[in-house]
Structure formats: structure tokens, C-alpha cells
Amino acid sequence: MRSRLAVLLCLVSAIPATSVDRKQNWTHLVRIGGNSLRMDRVDQIVRVATETNVFGIEVDNDIPGRYDSFLDPAEKLKAIKAVAAKAHAVKNFAFVYIAGLECITANADKTTHSFMKDHPDWVQRKITGEPAVFGGGSAFWISKGDEDVWISPYAPEWRRIYMERVRQIAATGIDGVYVDIPYWMTHFEGWENTWASFDDYTVEAFRRETKLDARKDIKLGDFKDPGFRRWVDFRIATLTAFMREIDANVKSVNRNCMTIAEIYPGIEEEAVRVGADVYEMYGVVDAIAHEYNLASGGGTAAAKTPLDWWGHLAGIQSFRSFAQGKPTWMLTYSWDGEKGVDLRDAMANMFMAQVMAGANLWDARGHVMSGSNDLPTRTRTFGWIKDHAQTFYAPRNPIAPVGVYFSPRTRNYFAEEFIDSYKGTLALLMQSHIEFQVVTPATLQSFAGPVLILPEVKCLSPEEIESIRSYAAVGRALVATGETGRYDERGETRGANPIHQLLGLKRSDLKVTGTTGTKFIYDPECPGRAYWHLLTEEFDSRAATGNAAGSRFDEFRNRHVSELMQVSSFSPAVEVSASPFVAALIARVEGKPSVFLANFKGLRSKEIATQLPEQNIKISFQGKPGSRIRILPFLGKVRDLKPDYTSGKVVCVIPELDKGAVVWVE
């Protein structure tokens, strides 16, 4: 192997988890359609993309993921070069799919040579020694008679050949290399709890890094064990370093070629199990395509409940924060045969929610990457987004947000407790139409909003503690819940909790508020988690009828927002009055305070995909006489709203909102 883990970790740590501000490029504006690539399909691919307003053409002939072309890529390289040239001729861009750590040998049951037959030592393994090799039916993309293997990223000769193939692909002139499934094998049946891989190469790399034998010295699956936590960190760092090396090889031959990772785990526990953490990976690639379906709830758009949509938005807003100016692509699925739902409505809901959240769209058929459920719907929607691209994809800057802290280490070691608290906190703010910003270790020091919420942030480093101390010292308010601060960044229990010391707490079992000196709320019961649990019990049935009055979640939400405002003396810069079934995402876009609205009222999983209209939404901006308020409804045209001026504010009312809209003042 050309580089050892210690070197790889140094390379990763030298790159910040977030990128510096950069000029936008084609990856920020994509409207994606996918295609299977053969030389005889090149003209058709580019023609259909042009006709349906696709910008950013995905093509798939997977050189390293098919054993024959892994060995001899010549013919497939010609097709990649041809489609790149055709795309450029019509002022479009193309990127090509390659597998990360998976390789399929076609008809392996009838051939002398296959990946596994030739290189059994390159394959990932369970701790029992069982290899990660599968046959037809293990996944929908594996045909009968085929052999599917999952490879150790530490297999030196495989990695050498793989990076050579990456350079050859980038040298064709293609605009992007799109890497799918850079995963440890933990997502097929029977492998979910393996915490693979325990192949010789990986075990030796871990031993060099930690002096621990992964087969003997760790308690597999036990997060109380320091050795297992090091194994968790090692697995994440390994895949991040793998993607960084791919990007370095891409750029070494084509500096304008982008590296994109496709990742299905989002903010939840799956990221830890699979080892592909988008928080870390955004720092080493140019974009991430999130196949964020089941993790965010519901699977397809047609199957999502109203609460699933809020989980989806929580994920996307987290991704947008992790990206730090890089684009967020959403490879999610709209409709896969749900008979009770019109596929066009399902597509519209997915496109609306994601564009309002600032993510780039990918239109696909069913649950595959290519095709479309309805080309006319794609054409119309993509054309509308093309006409309003700056409205949705210009940088969104904060105005006066409440911060919600995402702690990668807490998620890694205490996923269940943290994620419920985190998502519940985001949902409470979104459903109260309060501007928020996801804050991370990379952005904590620069965060200047009036309130910072630490939702069950169990693990904090000394550097994070010091940044929080500095934040509170200038009069800003803190909200600390649950066991925030109990553990250090390695997951070790502290003798004394520095957050409790900062807040001057005498006891940790009582709720305390402070309005003099340090302004804070300390709540050991964690309201974010409590709110999320209330939502799971009540929200969908209430959303179906559009009536939140008298619900426990609505009473809880109003009470906690009032308490937050009182302790922090916080007054929103933009005020939105609407039901909790409407999301309001607030930001400054090209200097204009803007509100991106998404309505989920009336939706029912697999039954109803047309919303109940939200009526008489009131929005108040800071402004003066002469200010102009404009609205762009989803798939509609820009028009003016009647403004009212009062006490330094300009106010408008939206009589009716069907799906979504963006409103701004200028």
C-alpha cells in the first residue's frame, strides 16, 4: 500500500470539515437525470437531457465495479469520452458513475475467473472470517449467476489499480466522477451487526494505528468499550481518506473534474454502522448525492407521512450546513408503484420540498437512478427551476438564527438519544417558523446568533467547551439539555461536567433558568426528544385534517417557544404566522430577506399527495415604506403582495398556499 492509515488520517485532518467559501460552479445548479451508458446511446442520452431540461447528465458504465472492465477499461473509456464531448457541445455537463468498494463479476458461476476466485484476500470479512461475497437476489442489482464482492480499502494492489482507473476516467474530459457505495459491508441481510471488516489488511492497519487487535481487543458493538469506539472512529476515517484519495487522483489529471460521493446514510445511526459519514466527507469531495430515503422516513415521496417530510427537511438542512457552500444533491425517489397516489403529485411534492430547502433535484424512475416516472413533469419542473435558479441556489446567509448544535461524536457514540433530541429540536423550531442554523464543530467559533441550543450533546471537546464559553460570555443565551457535556470527545466520562460549571448548576436533576449573568435554560429531561415523541404519536393524524388546536405537541411547542423567547430576550428578524404543518426556512439571499415555504397539510402516506391549502399566512419583515414584497409560488410566476407598513416593519398576507412558495422583501 502506498500510504498507511496514519498518513491518511493526517491528510484528512489537514482538511477542515467544511470548505471555505468558493465561487459557484455547475455542480450548484444541476437538475439531474440518470442514464445507462453505451456508445450507441450517447446521442440519445444528450438529446433527451436537452429536451427535458436536465443540467448535469449522469451516465453509468461503472468501470471499476464490473470485473471485466476493472481489468480492461478501454471500451468503456471511449464511451465516457464520447458522452462528455456531446454534452459539452450543447453547453451541458456530464458525470460518470463508478462503484466504490463493490465489484460484480457477471456469470461468475460459469467462468474460470472472478474477483473472488482470483483475489479472495482483497475481500471484506466478518470477524468469523466469512467473506463479503453474494449471489443473485442479494440485492436488486445483482443478477442470477453473478458474483458480488465488497472489497477492503486496504487491499494494496486493488487500491493501486482502482486509482489508476480513476485517473483514466478523469482524463477522458468527463466533468465529474461519481462514487457510489464507499461502504463497509453492514447493510446486507446477515451483515447488519458485523461492524466489518476484519480482513487481514484492515486488521493490520488498525493495529498499526492503535496497537489493538480488532479481532481480540475490542468488544464488538459495545459503545462503553474504548477500543470499540476507536474502531468506530477508524472505520469512518478510513472511508473519508479513501474518498480524499479518489479526489486527489481525479484532480491530478483533470483539475476541473468534480468528485461526487453517493451516500445513503444521513445524520442518523446508519452513518456510524456503514462508516460513511457525510459530515466528514463534505470536506474531501466537491458534492454529495444523498440517497436519503428510508433513513428520513417513508421511502418514496408517495409513501411519506407528514412527519416523514419534517425528518427529511431536518436531514437536508443538516447537509446544507455540513456542506459549507458546496452543493447538496438529493437522489431520492418519488413514486414506486403506490397505487393510491398520482405519480405526478408525488414528484411535485418531492421536487417542491427539496428545492425550497436549497437542494439539487434528481429525477429517477421507481427506485433506480435512471429514467423518470413522468418526463413531462420533469420537463416542466426542471424548466421552472432553470428560470429561477438564483432564487433557490444563490448562497443562503443567516439573518438572526437560533443555533442547533450537531455533534458528530455524540451521534457516533450515542446515536439514538442524540438524534431524537436533535430532530425534535429542529422540528420544534421549523414548526414554530423560527429561523435556525445548524451549528457544527467547524462553525461553532463563528456562530453569532442570539441563542445556541445543545440538544443532548453528550460529547464535547475542550475546544468546543471554550467556544461555548466565549459565546455565552458576550450575553448570548444557551439551552443545554439532557447529559450535555458529560463526556469528552473520546466518549470518556468526565469527573466534572464543564457545561454545568459554566452555568453554575448545583444539581443536574432539576430544570434551571438563568436571566442574569449567563442567560440559559438547563433542562435534564430534553424537550427536543420529548417533542419528537409527541410528534410520532399525534402529528400525522392532525396534519391529515389540518387541525393542531388542542394537541399535546402544539401546546408543548408554544410553551417552549415562549420560554425560549423570555429567557433569551430574542426577537425574530422575520416573523411568520402559519400552522405547524407549514415549514418556513428563513435566510438572506442576494441581500434580500427570504422565506421558503413548504406545505405538508393534508398528506397521507400512499393515499393522498395533494395538500390542503394553508390560508392567510402572515409574514413580517423588517422594512420601511417603499419596500416591495414579492412571491414566487411553486411552478408559478413572480408577483407582488400587498405590503402594510407599521412600526418599522413591512407585513404581507398570503391568502392561500397550495404546495410551496418563496417570499422576499426588496
Model-inferred region functions:
Residues 128-313, 318:
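Polysaccharide-binding and catalytic clefts of secreted carbohydrate-active enzymes
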Residues 39-65, 171-176, 286-288, 350-357, ...:
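Catalytic domains of carbohydrate-active enzymes, especially glycoside hydrolases
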Residues 6-14:
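Bacterial N-terminal signal peptides
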Residues 20-40, 401-409:
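An acidic-aromatic substrate-binding cleft motif
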Residues 34-51, 156-169, 270-280, 343-351:
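Short, acidic/polar
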Residues 28-34, 57-59, 94-97, 177-179, ...:
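Hydrophobic faces of well-ordered beta-strands that scaffold small-molecule active sites
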Residues 21, 228, 236, 240-265, ...:
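Carbohydrate-binding surfaces of carbohydrate-active enzymes
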Residues 51-172, 184-187:
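Acidic/aromatic-lined carbohydrate-recognition and catalytic surfaces
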